[in-house]
Amino acid sequence: MKKTALYSWHEEAGAKIIDFGGYLMPVQYRGIIAEHHAVRSAAGLFDVSHMGNFYVRGARAKEFLQYMTTNDLDNAEDGQAQYNLMLYPHGGIVDDLIIYRIDSETFFLIVNASNAQKDFEWLQQHIAAFEGVVLEDHTDQLSLIALQGPLALNILATVFPALDVPALGAFRFCKVLFQGTEVMIAGTGYTGEKGVEICLPNAMALPLWEALFEAGKESGIQPIGLGARDTLRLEMGYSLYGHEIDQDTNPLEARLKWVVKMGKGHFMGKEACQQVEGNLKRGVAGFSLDGRVLPRQHFKLYNSDRQEIGWVCSGTLSPTLQEPVGTCNVVREYLKPGTPILVEVRGSLHTGVIRRLPFVTTSLS
């Protein structure tokens, strides 16, 4: 089992540690609900160093990534990040990822922890056709810290006074020095709040973590575990691999058509997406349940005639709304917000309704 460079800090802080993606990671400190509210109201600090990260380099690096992913990197400038997908030929999703364009021949990729080895092998499997392109795995050398919340950028400015924080912007990134070491700061996140994700060498993770905590002390900054990270992303309707998206789900079914650029050249899985386009049979939507029962992944959904129409992708008790919410994969006719549904929970059917995503408004709304 791997440990991040911040593992000892989490342990000393009394975090509950679990195995996640082959890493020993903090799932909670004070409690998921308290941590969730801290991010929505002030600021939270996340250790997400378990995420996989790769460099793709070479004169044909962009050409290679254009073929391997669905979004259009011609729309990304140097210093810009782009949400993206890798597909199998049949249209199922290999993974979702963020690609950072450092320059025309250098790209940095952040992928899901549980898929890192699979993703690396998938990319490596297809790289030979693009002569001179090199794929490097830097996962074990780098740490990733997320600072998120309405007050996050104020805290960031305290630690990096020379950084032009307003100019950073969503899905923009820059490289700056921290105690003489170069770090990459990106206007990205997984919470729906203002914030950044900071990538840096392992040796500098603890000094930066402690500096951000010191700077955010008066603002109420809190350490945040993976439990609250999940409730925060679910309130926004963000996809999680293995839940809303997987190898059997086409991105057009998963509310991710905006990431699939049919107008660019050929890419892996394009034909499968073209076949589905205009002929969707299913889709992913939000829903809420009456009462206090918790919907969990794989629970079945029914229409008012008790015909099975889908399943739960993710579910939780929303700390913000104080009601059970989730995402579901349902037959197309039931995707409209306001449509009544039934969800089977431990053998009983509970009433609910399809909801528009996201469930909440945030500091970025």
From Swiss-Prot:
Keywords: Aminotransferase, Transferase. InterPro entries: GCS_T, GCS_T_bac, GCST_C, GCV_T_N, GcvT/YgfZ/DmdA, GcvT/YgfZ_C, TrmE/GcvT_dom1. The keyword Transferase applies. It holds the Pfam family GCV_T. The keyword Transmembrane helix does not apply. Its EC number is 2.1.2.10. GO terms for cellular component: cytosol; glycine cleavage complex. It catalyses: N(6)-[(R)-S(8)-aminomethyldihydrolipoyl]-L-lysyl-[protein] + (6S)-5,6,7,8-tetrahydrofolate = N(6)-[(R)-dihydrolipoyl]-L-lysyl-[protein] + (6R)-5,10-methylene-5,6,7,8-tetrahydrofolate + NH4(+). GO terms for molecular function: aminomethyltransferase activity; transaminase activity. Gene3D superfamilies: Aminomethyltransferase beta-barrel domains (3.30.70.1400), Aminomethyltransferase fragment (4.10.1250.10), Probable tRNA modification gtpase trme, domain 1 (3.30.1360.120). It is an enzyme of class 2 (transferase). GO terms for biological process: glycine decarboxylation via glycine cleavage system. The glycine cleavage system is composed of four proteins: P, T, L and H. Belongs to the GcvT family. NCBIfam families: gcvT (TIGR00528), PRK00389.1 (NF001567). The glycine cleavage system catalyzes the degradation of glycine. This is Aminomethyltransferase.
